[in-house]
Amino acid sequence: MRLSIFSISRNGQAMSHSFHPPQRILMGPGPSDVSARVLGALGRPTIGHLDPLFIELMDDTKQLLQYVFKTQNELTIPLSAPGSAGMEAAFVNLVSPGDTVIVCQNGVFGGRMKENVERCGAHAVMVQDRWGDPVDPQKVEEAFAAHPDANLLAFVHAETSTGVRSDAKTLCELAQRHDALTIVDTVTSLGGIDLCVDDWGADAVYSGTQKCLSCVPGLSPMTFSPKAVSRIQNRATKIQSWFLDMQLVMGYWGGNSKRAYHHTAPVNALYALHESLLILQEEGLDASFARHRANHLELVSGLEAMGLSMAVTPEWRLPQLNAVCIPDGTDDATVRSRLLHEFNLEIGAGLGELAGKQWRIGLMGHASNPVNVQQCLTALRHVLGH
């Protein structure tokens, strides 16, 4: 049934009215289902973004983010913008005109990293891997050997477009051996698989709230190492974005009671993020990772029993984002449309060169549970005629 937010008045004019969305089961690549507890936090009374109580919430949110990132980095914040802005913030702060940056691409989002490097006036050296494979550390080593002036390595930990995990620990260690900093995309990995910022030595790490954290979209958790902060503070050129300039943002998220006004933070969205991080802390990171993996294995077993094939080898699969090969003769859009309209179930289409070839089934955060696994399998059996 199509819902409309418009009605026709007596004089024939269109009138808007309140929007009441249906209750979907969100099993795509994000956003994921948001719990009633987080939605309840979102609806609490708004207070000022410099209110002493809100400052306390900011400090506690920072500590919770340090917990999930496994870091002691002082500059750990939820950027007041979505994950794509987190990506841009990492690049505009750490990349200067004329720099050489090694960018790993094994899916859509590595390509977006390249765009950011070039918009900063720097040179992107591309390390290409097949979409569906992890980043090959040997290729990265060869890129550093060919470009010894490279001062930054950028890669995606969990490639959202393909459902592939890359070996972030090895890649960060490789960059350190070449005196290069790292920018790491963890939009899909944070909260779903292990992420050890300090142990791995990652320098600028960004994520999103709408995936394994099961919060509303619109914020980008970020963390910067002391080495990254030093590079930001010692730049020879001004950061090209005022809003994303971490030297200014640090004044608002700093560790003292005198906060410098930079922008009006999305107060209620931060209530929601704080609540979602509390839920994750209560469960425990290891328990969250185990839950995601158990539900992933159950889903894969059911899909393979239907004759469907997974697109990624088991070692590198993301438990929170399952890439499934679309059977020959099956119309991608028709299947997804029927799932949505007959079962209120959303799964994702393939992106880029994988459009029409793969489905992406998310088991992220609050949505990663046995009930959703069985509902998804039942719906697919019905739609595919199994």
Show where each model-derived region lies:
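Conserved PLP-binding catalytic core of the aspartate aminotransferase-like
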Residues: 309-342
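Active-site C-terminal subdomain of aminotransferase-like
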Residues: 33-34, 210-301, 305
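A glycine-/small-polar-enriched, mobile loop at the entrance of the PLP active site in fold-type I
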Residues: 23-80, 84
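Active-site phosphate-binding strand-loop segment of PLP-dependent enzymes
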Residues: 134-191, 204, 212
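Conserved beta-loop-alpha segment that forms the PLP phosphate-binding cup at the N-terminus of a helix
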Residues: 72-102, 106, 110-114
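Conserved active-site segment immediately N-terminal to the catalytic lysine
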Residues: 198-210
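PLP-dependent enzyme catalytic core of the Aspartate aminotransferase-like
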Residues: 8, 353, 357-386
